């Protein structure tokens, strides 16, 4: 509570506002299909509370979201439209999300789900919708896209 009070004081806002922004940036991970509870990225929350003067920074890559595998994957696969992923809803059978795929034939959205870039929201008994869990992860995913797109253009000249 003292850390939240300190953060609110630094920003000149009420603690409730800090809670709201923490949720927007760092919450949203779902780890059980049978629960509507979401989890915060603890690394990001701890880093923010330790240094609120830095603002709501992106700590995703520091928390294990390092994109090496994803970047390598996108060098050989180009079936995922980063710019439009947010505008289309993708639904998968829960068994598909838990299946152990070979890296050569895993659907892109499921790879991103298994790597933590998407979280699954259960829609019906066996169907889940994949979404980005929060702004921190969404920003990281877009960063991957822009870096990958730029590199592809440079390599293909």
Model regions: which residues?
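Amphipathic alpha-helical segments of the small helical/lid subdomains adjacent to P-loop NTPase cores
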Residues: 1-48, 82
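Extended alpha-helical interface modules used as scaffolds for assembling large macromolecular complexes
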Residues: 40-157
